Amino acid sequence: MSPQLVGLLAAIFAGQARVLGMQAQNAHRAACGDSPAYTDEAFSIEAAHLDRLSVEASNAS
């Protein structure tokens, strides 16, 4: 695997970790009776970023 692909894979995993953190924060806030910290728009932004990274990784291989 090339260094470029390793970097892209790391960025994809970091994005997935951000999404999991966002989900956990929203679940915690819901359990406390608070409104979500992250909206659908925030998740859509992360999804679009992950999509761009996946296309870049596909083109790099």
PLM features per residue range, with description:
Residues 1-27:
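N-terminal acidic leader/helix
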Residues 21-61:
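Short, charge-rich amphipathic interface segments used for partner binding and complex assembly
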